[in-house]
Design a protein with these regions (language model features):
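Structural signature of tandem alpha-helical TPR/SEL1-like repeats
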Residues: 78-81, 111-120, 146-155, 182-185
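Amphipathic alpha-helices of TPR/Sel1-like and other helical repeat/solenoid scaffolds
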Residues: 34, 38-47, 75-95, 114-128
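Alpha-solenoid helical repeat scaffolds
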Residues: 87, 122, 156-157, 191
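TPR/TPR-like alpha-solenoid helical repeat scaffolds
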Residues: 62, 136-144, 168-181, 200-218, ...
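TPR/TPR-like (Sel1-like) alpha-helical repeat modules
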Residues: 157-164, 174-200
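Extreme N-terminal leader/anchor segments
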Residues: 1-50, 71
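Amphipathic alpha-helical repeat scaffolds of TPR domains
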Residues: 50-71, 92-108, 129-144, 165-176
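Low-complexity, acidic interaction segments enriched in glycine
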Residues: 109, 123, 185-286
Length: 286
């Protein structure tokens, strides 16, 4: 009986600490910072010939920061610093796939970060010449964010050549370049990325974006039905509800509201965007 009471008390205390500590942390502790690393040459000297180990330490420190910052404290991560750390880690060890995968998962939907991210992936592609993931990531970045389908097709073709057994590339190629449906291509891309992502926090963030794209596609299909039925385009998403094609406008996982633009496209006030701090100094120069 005493053991049961003791166990209950311990469990209650544990639950209280787990729930109350984040509030205490947010109120009294300063925001978690990712400290800027010294130049790559200095890191190389500090590694004493163990560049791969130094790169791995930087990667795990960055991943821990991201998990603590986003998953536990629910604060906005310093994505520019995160990129800088991963860039220097791959300067030390350009074969480290963890850095490239993590960078793609964290930065690929932040449009101002794409030129930096692509340079990082290009660096990896020069060394990991057998790895189909890197041209696959580059293809997605050029298509979805930079709106350069020809460039995207080049990288997708390379990814297909490196991994000829995958049916994903045929699906993406059809949706990107023949059917012209960017939303469906994005859904296919995210499902593939989620399937292969090991980091649970990144998987959660990608799943959130997937949910948003699925909501957009749901509305796009309803708009197509409306136009087919009434021989005219809907003026607002509310018309879909009035016509009985959908019960209600789905919520945006990012907290915004979906709306219909003048040219008939579904957008959201949240822009599905993450933050990227602009700084005068380019971290690539270090």
């Amino acid at each position: 009986m005493k053991q049961a009471i003791t166990g209950t008390i311990i469990l209650a205390l544990f639950i209280a600490v787990v729930n109350l500590y984040p509030r205490y942390q947010k109120k009294y502790e300063p925001p978690l910072r990712l400290h800027r690393l010294p130049p790559t040459l200095a890191l190389e000297i500090m590694s004493v010939g163990n560049k791969e180990l130094m790169a791995e330490i930087i990667f795990y420190n960055t991943e821990f920061y991201f998990g603590e910052k986003v998953g536990w404290r629910e604060e906005t991560p310093e994505l520019r610093r995160l990129y800088d750390a991963l860039n220097k880690a791959t300067d030390l060890d350009p074969y480290n796939i963890d850095c490239y995968y993590f960078a793609q998962g964290a930065l690929s939907w932040v449009k101002p970060a794409i030129p930096y991210l692509n340079r990082l992936l290009e660096k990896g592609l020069k060394h990991r010449t057998w790895d189909w993931y890197l041209p696959f990531f580059l293809s997605a970045n050029y298509y979805f964010q930079l709106k350069q389908p020809v460039k995207a097709a080049e990288y997708l073709k390379l990814a297909s050549r490196l991994n000829p057994r995958s049916s994903l590339f045929a699906t993406l190629t059809a949706r990107m370049f023949y059917e012209g449906n960017e939303t469906e291509a994005g859904i296919a891309y995210l499902r593939s990325l989620i399937k292969d992502t090991q980091n649970p926090l990144l998987r959660k963030r990608l799943a959130k974006r997937l949910k948003a794209l699925e909501a957009i596609r749901y509305l796009e299909l309803a708009l197509e039905k409306y136009e087919s039925k009434y021989k005219q385009k809907a003026k607002s998403l509310g018309d879909l509800v009035k016509a009985g094609l959908i019960e209600s406008i789905p919520p945006d996982p990012y907290g915004g509201k979906f709306y219909l633009t003048k040219d008939g496209k579904v957008y959201t006030t949240s822009k599905l965007a993450e933050g990227w701090q602009k700084k005068k100094n380019d971290p690539d120069k270090n």
